[in-house]
Amino acid sequence: METYTLANGVAIPKIGFGTWQIAEGEEAYNSVSFALKAGYTHIDTAQIYGNEVSVGKAIADSNLAREDIFLTTKLWNDKHDYELAKTSIDESLERLGVDYLDLLLIHWPNPKALRENDDWKAGNAGAWKAMEEAYKEGKVRAIGVSNFMQHHLEALIETAEIVPHVNQILLAPGCNQEDLVAYCQERDILLEAYSPLGTGSIFGNEDVEAVAERNGKSVAQVALRWSLQKGFLPLPKSVTPKNIEGNLDIFDFDLSEEDMAVLDKIQGIKTQDDPDKVNF
């Protein structure tokens, strides 16, 4: 599997298997197990997904060594506090059945409960301090954030000892977030792309279908290839074996500049939810 190198030198596989909305139990276990057999070596989960136990069991039951799997989870919005985050990290490790995480993220920057008087800033700073300590202790190999816009990153970096290694945001053809992407790339913050198929909104788009036909690939494959050629790390998710396998088949072709330009300008694609206004 091809890799990117994070700012701290840690190698991270260029595509990951996302597990959002994949239910705890048989569905999560079977999906992750199949993904690992298909060739994924990067699994992305989160505390709020509720499937850490099954994800961890699938990893433990695979034929892969722990060091050959890149595992990510995320702190939920009720853990934006130093002590709560510190405890929560250990709880995730226990649920996943592992001794360390490869990547730990703050899931959202501005929980609804912390919006008054910009309390989110102190909340993020406290959680980040706990994450920095976990990083230094070897419990986590890299730390980052998710859904952070530029002003959230600026506030965090102001008090942080370690600049986030990753920012996971919604990126898909037609949802480019160019200013935020430029800000992160200038600071060597790797961009992970969740919902890299625009939560399905690219399907049925005539322009995307034309690009797919020209390249002899599926709509999903050209969207994921677009992410790679932008320098992003896509995190597709599926419970369908055919799609799980197909989403990996993106390393044997290149999109032309013309095709990339077409995908950049796609209209009507799902865009990033405003993290300052989400209802949680």
Regions found by a protein language model. Give the residues of each.
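Short acidic capping loops at alpha-helix termini that bridge into adjacent secondary structure
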Residues: 14, 65-69, 99-103, 141-142, ...
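Acidic (Asp/Glu)-rich catalytic clusters
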Residues: 7, 56-66, 93-98, 157-160, ...
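Active-site mouth loops of central-metabolism enzymes
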Residues: 15-26, 75-82, 115-117
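Short, acidic/polar
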Residues: 23-36, 81-96, 149-154, 175-176
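CE4/NodB-like, metal-dependent polysaccharide N-deacetylase domain
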Residues: 85-106, 133-137
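A short, structured active-site edge motif that brings together acidic residues
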Residues: 66-79, 100-109, 171
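N-terminal binding-site loop/beta-alpha segment at the start of enzyme catalytic domains
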Residues: 1-69, 198, 262, 278-279
